[in-house]
Amino acid sequence: MNFIIATRRSKLAQVQTEIIIDLLNKKHDIECEKLLIETVGDKILEVSLDKIGGKGLFVKDIEVAMLEQRADAAVHSMKDVPYEMPKGFEIIAIPKREDVRDAFISLDNIKFKDLRKGAKIGTSSRRRAAQLKLLRPDLDIVPIRGNVQTRIEKIKKENLDGIILAVAGLKRVNLEHLITDYFDTKEMVPAIGQGALGIEVMEEHPKKELFKDLDHYNSKICVLAERAFMRELDGDCHSTIGAYASIKDNIMHIIGIFERKNKIIKKEITGTKDQYEKLGIALAEHILKD
């Protein structure tokens, strides 16, 4: 049996797809090949995502490949997947999640707490920018886009003091050694789905159950809780929004942030993990009442 897996052309996207291909091969002895697609989001790099349609721009062209039966499945970073799936598509599996934290990479290995006043920090994320300003109001936030390597190179090219990237992506492309600091999830609440990969299929695909075997239940329900939070707040990359759900002894804890009326609101909630979707919705409702 031979499967074709669609993904973006970036090194990180290809590495993430190879992780899924390796899992499939070990589980079912299935041969897979990648279909590399340059998405609209990859082509337009000079404009921030919130001005050109959001993170869904990384997904739509890949879904077209499945619709045209050029691919059997797609691998996405779950933080790039809009909460509303197009009709006929589904996220069939979310394998075990990687590190969810954000990382700080500085020019000369200077710790975040030791940055000079007015230091220039590169990030294209509204979520990261807002939380950086809460931690250090003096910082100068500079918008940057591009793949992991391009952003790292921009530290020198654009005379930045540092940049913020997801730990998971750096680990997957073997660049974790460049990390100067790790942000705690309470001081820098991650993006919804950060660190998680999702396998997307057409609902009618005859072999979709083979992908389901790659699902990691606790990882999946944590991501689904975060996405329920996002859906309730109608959040996207136009929003300053973040959430992180974790499980210990069957108890789920979710921390979430959302900008409302020009104010960053941060709330937490705890409950049994079988109520994961209700917890995400309840956390959003708490924020809306603030």
Swiss-Prot record:
Question: What reaction(s) does this enzyme catalyze?
Answer: 4 porphobilinogen + H2O = hydroxymethylbilane + 4 NH4(+)
Query: An example Gene Ontology cellular component term from the record?
Result: cytoplasm
Which Enzyme Commission number(s) are listed?
2.5.1.61
Q: Which InterPro entries match?
A: HemC (IPR000860), Porphobilin_deaminase_N (IPR022417), Porphobilinogen_deaminase_C (IPR022418), Porphobilinogen_deaminase_C_sf (IPR036803)
* Gene Ontology terms for molecular function: hydroxymethylbilane synthase activity
Recorded hits in SUPFAM superfamilies, A to Z, give: Periplasmic binding protein-like II (SSF53850), Porphobilinogen deaminase (hydroxymethylbilane synthase), C-terminal domain (SSF54782)
Task: Name the coenzymes or cofactors required.
Answer: dipyrromethane
The cofactor note from the UniProt entry for this protein is: Binds 1 dipyrromethane group covalently.
Residues modified as S-(dipyrrolylmethanemethyl)cysteine? C237
**Per UniProt, what is one Pfam family of this protein?**
Porphobil_deam
Annotated pathway, please? Porphyrin-containing compound metabolism; protoporphyrin-IX biosynthesis; coproporphyrinogen-III from 5-aminolevulinate: step 2/4
Q: Which UniProt keywords apply?
A: Porphyrin biosynthesis, Transferase
Keyword Transferase part of the UniProt annotation? yes
Does the UniProt entry include the keyword Nucleus? no
- Give the main EC class: transferase
Ranges annotated as spanning the membrane: none
GO biological process terms, alphabetically, are: protoporphyrinogen IX biosynthetic process
Additional note from the record: The porphobilinogen subunits are added to the dipyrromethane group.
Cross-referenced HAMAP family: Porphobil_deam
Quote the subunit structure annotation.
Monomer.
Q: Which family does it belong to?
A: Belongs to the HMBS family.
Instruction: Sum up the protein's function in the record's words.
Output: Tetrapolymerization of the monopyrrole PBG into the hydroxymethylbilane pre-uroporphyrinogen in several discrete steps.
The name of this protein is Porphobilinogen deaminase
Q: What's the source species for this entry?
A: Clostridium botulinum (strain Langeland / NCTC 10281 / Type F)
Q: Taxonomy-wise, where does this protein's organism fall, top ranks first?
A: Bacteria, Bacillati, Bacillota, Clostridia, Eubacteriales
